[in-house]
A protein has these predicted regions:
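A short, well-structured edge-of-sheet supersecondary motif
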Residues: 1-11
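Active-site SXXK
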Residues: 6, 19-42, 132
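Solvent-exposed, polar/charged alpha-helical surfaces in well-ordered, non-transmembrane soluble domains
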Residues: 7, 30, 34, 67-71, ...
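Soluble non-cytosolic domains of exported or imported proteins
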Residues: 14-26, 60-68, 75-79, 90-98, ...
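Short, well-structured active-site flanking segments
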Residues: 34-47, 143-151
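Acidic helix-start/capping segments at beta-turn-to-alpha-helix junctions
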Residues: 43-54, 122, 156-157
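Conserved catalytic neighborhood of penicillin-recognizing serine enzymes
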Residues: 51-87, 163-167
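Penicillin-recognizing serine hydrolase domain
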Residues: 92-167
Length: 167
């Protein structure tokens, strides 16, 4: 895909819908960056801590800054973090998925439908390679997103002082 024009230079089945898996977290991160502030406090619910690996492993009630959780999300692809962020920004996972789908429509990602914030399998949670290219291109225009994904490692701490190393 040409970054300036958005034209697809080469594609193979680029319009075929497929599960998104962890590329979903690109949209989760972008929405959090656009609809919250880095210093906001985000807590882990029982739903968040119940997510399967890969996960941060925080306990129910643990609180972190949004900035730290976005690093957890993008550096190590933590499923529990995605749910905590989604519940904070969207009020619920379902509310956040609605926001994800609204943003997808705004960006012209017409073959994309979000159900989860972490990319775990769910019926109807899918996109096409072409739409994912468009999303990645949009993401790379966000300086805060780029700063996060270019961070090689980071140690984050919850509000009780428990530290977690991200690499």
């Amino acid at each position: 895909m040409d970054a300036e024009s958005g034209r697809i230079l080469y594609g193979k089945e680029e319009q075929t819908p497929r599960p998104m898996a962890s590329t979903t977290k690109i949209m989760t991160c972008l929405l959090a960056l656009e609809q919250s502030s880095p210093s906001e406090e985000v807590s882990f619910s029982s739903r968040a801590v119940s997510m399967p690996k890969v996960h941060l492993g925080a306990s129910k009630g643990s609180s972190f800054t949004m900035n730290d959780l976005l690093h957890s999300l993008m550096l190590e692809s933590h499923n529990d973090t995605a749910v905590a962020v989604a519940e904070h920004v969207g009020g619920s996972v379902e509310g956040f998925a609605d926001k994800m789908n609204q943003k997808a429509a705004q960006l012209g990602l017409n073959a994309t439908h979000f159900v989860t914030p972490n990319g775990l399998d769910a019926e109807g949670h899918q996109s096409t390679p072409a739409d994912m290219c468009r999303l990645a291109s949009y993401a790379c225009q966000n300086k805060d997103f780029l700063k996060i994904i270019h961070t090689p490692s980071k140690t984050i701490s919850d509000k009780k002082g428990h530290s977690y190393s991200l690499t």
